[in-house]
UniProtKB/Swiss-Prot annotation:
Catalyzes the decarboxylation of orotidine 5'-monophosphate (OMP) to uridine 5'-monophosphate (UMP). It is an enzyme of class 4 (lyase). This is Orotidine 5'-phosphate decarboxylase. It catalyses: orotidine 5'-phosphate + H(+) = UMP + CO2. Keywords: Decarboxylase, Lyase, Pyrimidine biosynthesis. The gene is pyrF. SUPFAM superfamilies: Ribulose-phoshate binding barrel.
Length: 244
């Protein structure tokens, strides 16, 4: 079942918190700490290794939170289709698949029997042109991102994961009705760490992002809930005030 239409998000659902923790106990602490400031959570590989991944997924759903399963599936089409078929039984809003192979994305969309929205990972925000060249791809990241976004669109995916630096180019290439979710968001007071292609909240939405993923800028804040609320305010301003 192709779910090509983008996920309809409320303004406060456009800030996705990266729940990168090693245990269910810590996950529950963060859910409680952030309260109503966060309505959408991304759960990834570190939590999967704890063996408590699906308990946390249920915990989030029970709290009325949206869930983003970020496991970046990349395998032969039949295997990825099987995983998506099983995940369709869970209350998942977003799920990621690597955007490197069109038949794999096609198989995933055909196996999706729920309202789960599939996002293609284009080029990780930790990667530069030099990193791509080492992999035999001697091209600018934006060119690779656009190529993979177009392939994802053709395969029936709901959208892509991409840096805010490439969001405007994706929107021009693919048009509306296709979700662009941007990680690598950084504020002035937070180091970039391993992120290379970063962007501010306001700039990401100005470039056409539908949602952003934020982890360390919230986790490292003196008051994480207040930091998240400040980001919610910035998002609301970016989406409601006319650009100059």
């Amino acid at each position: 079942m192709m779910n090509h239409t983008p996920l309809l998000l409320g303004i406060r659902e456009r800030l996705i918190f990266a729940l990168d923790v090693p245990s269910r106990t810590q996950a529950l602490e963060w859910i409680d700490r952030l309260g109503d400031a966060i309505s959408f959570y991304k759960i990834g590989m570190e939590l999967l290794a704890s063996g408590e991944y699906f308990q946390v997924l249920d915990d989030l759903a029970s709290c009325g939170k949206r869930v983003f399963v970020d496991l970046k599936f990349f395998d032969i089409p039949a295997t990825v289709a099987g995983v998506i078929r099983r995940l369709s039984q869970w209350p998942i809003s977003y799920c990621t698949i690597h955007g490197w192979h069109a038949p794999m994305m096609q198989a995933a969309t055909e196996a999706n029997t729920s309202n789960m929205h599939l996002l293609a990972v284009t080029v990780l925000t930790s990667m530069t042109r030099a990193d791509l060249a080492k992999m035999g791809i001697d091209r600018e990241p934006v060119d690779v991102v656009i190529e993979r976004a177009l392939a994802a669109h053709m395969a029936g995916m709901s959208g892509v994961i991409a840096s805010g630096q490439e969001a405007a180019a994706i929107r021009r290439a693919v048009g509306s009705g296709f979700s662009i979710v941007c990680p690598g968001i950084r504020t002035n007071h937070v180091p970039h760490n391993d992120q290379q292609r970063t962007m501010s909240i306001t700039a990401a939405f100005a470039n056409g992002a539908d949602a952003i993923v934020v982890g360390r800028p919230i986790r490292m804040a003196e008051d994480p809930q207040a930091a998240a609320e400040a980001m919610q305010t910035e998002i609301m301003t970016a989406l409601t005030e006319p650009s100059t």
